């Protein structure tokens, strides 16, 4: 019972080794047991033969002695005795030879057995070494198995922990998903409310503008009525002249028509302190809608018949905005100037003589203005802004008409197409969007692959300047890239000459280039020792006749180059104390306006 317990206490591998040793002992003992028994018998026979040989040798010596001691009766050996002794000697000799032969065989057998024993000993040593190695391997494997069991336990615990965490995260995810759904619904509701409030705000602004317009009209009517009541000095010569012009073949009798003509002549003859001053003051307080653009001032043929003058003198320096001014643009009639700044407003200014008089502001943007453009008639103003949207106002009543949203980044440029019914906008989100103002929707979105800093348009092509140093040419009809041109720096601005055959570009490598659109070749490169592009949206401009280009530098100087020679015509400084962001040249060719990162705008002309 105790042996059974001890055997049960042994590990299985020990019992396995013990059984293998017993099996090997049985196999080896069966193989050599017969040999060992035969060997023992041979040893016994050898000992027996040795004893017999010694006995025979003793008898051999004893027989002659006996014969010598006891010879025949006559004291001589007879023949029979001699013959017997000879036969006995031969027999003994043969037995001895046979014994020696067997002894040699046994000796050889002993040697062979010794060799076999040595081989077996070596095999046993090798087996013992293998057994020791196997035991060591078993020990290592047991240790490794123990480590693996420990790791398995750790992994099972970690797996259980992960399962618990996963279950907790799943519960959390389900809760967060519900919150997200609820938040999305709330966000949608807030967006809807926000859009409604924006619409109400736009309506409120439009109503306020309408009220202001009505108040101005009422004030104008009142002052006109008061001015009409004032006594007006009459010059007799004028009355006589009017009468002669109006009634050369009539009598001198006064008629109602003649009375009206005299009244009109009297009003025209009023001195500066009378009716005209009152009307001028009234119009000076009105918005820009009081100045409709004269049709003869609208530039139907750009660049034709313009008297372009290179600016030399600062006529007017004024604070245009509360902060940085990013954009400036003249109306087609050259009388109205628009500026856009980081104060989220577009301001309108009237340019007359040497002054710029503030006429009103266009509100509705939620972030800084980045780009401004008038339509070809000067009736609408388009502005891009940092709130991911573009907006359109009517100039005559300062009302917000359209808000174009859809970009996911700040809109850096927006331009009218030539039909004034479509718009192209470029954004920091690396897309260009094509808008239809009639349907008020985005017709197409094109992924450009890089942030768009500026846009210009021709009849069939849109050209965009990008952050990746490339100018891309897009076909309006297919809205695909026709070609690309890579410059040495990031593109900050683009402009077209009046004939729309040359493209002006400005880049961050401080170079301006004129590109011939007919040959796709760089026609002229402009640079100057002190000129440095101040930002990624520094705007440059052609003169109305395409003979000059103007750009502002980072140190606040205004540079003018000749397109024909490529040389600097004029450098104007000392007015701006910060980097110039944008430059505009009036369609009449008489004025240039520059705006900077401070709040200043400078009106330049040649004097």
From Swiss-Prot:
Pfam families: ATG16, WD40. WD repeats lie at residues 320-359, 364-403, 406-445, 447-484, 486-525, 532-573, 575-607. Keywords: Autophagy, Coiled coil, Cytoplasm, Endosome, Lysosome, Membrane, Phosphoprotein, Protein transport, Repeat, Transport, WD repeat. Residues 207-230 are annotated as: WIPI2-binding. GO terms for molecular function: protein-membrane adaptor activity. Proteolytic cleavage by activated CASP3 leads to degradation and may regulate autophagy upon cellular stress and apoptotic stimuli. The keyword Membrane applies. Residues 79-230 form a coiled coil. GO terms for cellular component: Atg12-Atg5-Atg16 complex; autophagosome membrane; axoneme; cytoplasm; endolysosome membrane; phagophore assembly site membrane; sperm midpiece; vacuole-isolation membrane contact site. It comes from the Eukaryota. Residues 13-43 are annotated as: Interaction with ATG5. A motif (Caspase cleavage) lies at residues 296-299. Residues 230-242 are annotated as: RB1CC1-binding. It is found in: Cytoplasm; Preautophagosomal structure membrane; Endosome membrane; Lysosome membrane. It is a peripheral membrane protein. One of its GO terms (biological process) is microautophagy. The modification Phosphoserine is found at residues 139, 269, 287. Belongs to the WD repeat ATG16 family. Plays an essential role in both canonical and non-canonical autophagy: interacts with ATG12-ATG5 to mediate the lipidation to ATG8 family proteins (MAP1LC3A, MAP1LC3B, MAP1LC3C, GABARAPL1, GABARAPL2 and GABARAP). Acts as a molecular hub, coordinating autophagy pathways via distinct domains that support either canonical or non-canonical signaling. During canonical autophagy, interacts with ATG12-ATG5 to mediate the conjugation of phosphatidylethanolamine (PE) to ATG8 proteins, to produce a membrane-bound activated form of ATG8. The WD repeats are required for non-canonical autophagy but not for canonical autophagy. The WD repeats are required for the recruitment of LRRK2 to stressed lysosomes. Homodimer. Homooligomer. Heterooligomer with ATG16L2. Interacts with WIPI1. Interacts with WIPI2. Interacts with RB1CC1; the interaction is required for ULK1 complex-dependent autophagy. Interacts with ATG5. Part of the minor complex composed of 4 sets of ATG12-ATG5 and ATG16L1 (400 kDa); this complex interacts with ATG3 leading to disruption of ATG7 interaction and promotion of ATG8-like proteins lipidation. Part of the major complex composed of 8 sets of ATG12-ATG5 and ATG16L1 (800 kDa). This is Autophagy-related protein 16-1.
């Amino acid at each position: 019972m105790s042996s059974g317990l001890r055997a049960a206490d042994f590990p299985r591998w020990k019992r396995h080794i013990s059984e293998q040793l017993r099996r090997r002992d049985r196999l080896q003992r069966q193989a050599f047991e017969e040999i060992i028994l035969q060997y023992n018998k041979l040893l016994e026979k050898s000992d027996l033969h040795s004893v017999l040989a010694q006995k025979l040798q003793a008898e051999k010596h004893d027989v002659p002695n006996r014969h010598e001691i006891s010879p025949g009766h006559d004291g001589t050996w007879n023949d029979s005795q001699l013959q017997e002794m000879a036969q006995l000697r031969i027999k003994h000799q043969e037995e001895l030879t046979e014994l020696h032969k067997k002894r040699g065989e046994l000796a050889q057998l002993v040697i062979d057995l010794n060799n076999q024993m040595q081989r077996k000993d070596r095999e046993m040593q090798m087996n013992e070494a293998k057994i020791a190695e196997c035991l060591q391997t078993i020990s290592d494997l047991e240790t490794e198995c123990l480590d693996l069991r420990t790791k398995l336990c750790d992994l099972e615990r970690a797996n259980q922990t992960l399962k618990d965490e996963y279950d907790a995260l799943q519960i959390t995810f389900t809760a967060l998903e519900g919150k997200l759904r609820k938040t999305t619904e709330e966000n949608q509701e807030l967006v809807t409310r926000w859009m409604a409030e924006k619409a109400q705000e736009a309506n409120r602004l439009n109503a306020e503008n309408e009220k202001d317009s009505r108040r101005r009209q009422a004030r104008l009517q009142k002052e006109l009525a008061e001015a009409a009541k004032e006594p007006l000095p009459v010059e007799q010569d004028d009355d006589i002249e009017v009468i002669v012009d109006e009634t050369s073949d009539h009598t001198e009798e006064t008629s109602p028509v003649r009375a009206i003509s005299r009244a009109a002549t009297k009003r025209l003859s009023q001195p500066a302190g009378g009716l005209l001053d009152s009307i001028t003051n009234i119009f000076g307080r009105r918005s820009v809608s009081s100045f409709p653009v004269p049709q003869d001032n609208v530039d139907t043929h750009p660049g034709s018949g313009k008297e372009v003058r290179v600016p030399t003198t600062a006529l007017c320096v004024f604070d245009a905005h509360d902060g940085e001014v990013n954009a400036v643009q003249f109306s087609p009639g050259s009388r109205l100037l628009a500026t856009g700044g980081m104060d989220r407003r577009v301001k309108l200014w009237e340019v007359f003589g040497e002054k710029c008089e503030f006429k009103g502001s266009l509100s509705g943007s939620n972030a800084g203005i980045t780009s401004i453009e008038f339509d070809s008639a000067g009736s609408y103003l388009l502005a891009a802004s940092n709130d991911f949207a573009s907006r359109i106002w009517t100039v005559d009543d300062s009302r917000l008409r359209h808000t174009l949203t859809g970009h996911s980044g700040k809109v850096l440029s927006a331009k009218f197409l030539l039909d004034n019914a479509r718009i192209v906008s470029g954004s920091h989100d690396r897309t260009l969007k094509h808008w239809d103002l009639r349907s008020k929707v985005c017709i197409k979105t094109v992924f450009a692959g890089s942030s768009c800093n500026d846009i210009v348009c021709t009849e069939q092509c849109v050209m965009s300047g990008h952050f990746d140093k490339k100018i891309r040419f897009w076909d309006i009809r297919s809205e695909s890239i026709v070609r690309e041109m890579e410059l040495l720096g990031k593109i900050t601005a683009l402009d077209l000459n009046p004939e729309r055959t040359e493209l002006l570009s400005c880049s961050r490598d401080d170079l301006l280039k004129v590109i011939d659109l007919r040959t796709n070749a760089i026609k002229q490169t402009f640079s100057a020792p002190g000129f440095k592009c101040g930002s990624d949206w520094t705007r440059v401009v052609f003169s109305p006749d395409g003979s000059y280009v103007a750009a502002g530098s980072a140190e606040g100087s205004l540079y003018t180059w000749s397109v024909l020679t490529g040389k600097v015509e004029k450098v104007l400084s000392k007015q701006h104390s910060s980097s110039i962001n944008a430059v505009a040249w009036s369609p009449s060719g008489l004025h240039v306006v520059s705006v900077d990162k401070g709040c200043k705008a400078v009106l330049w002309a040649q004097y």
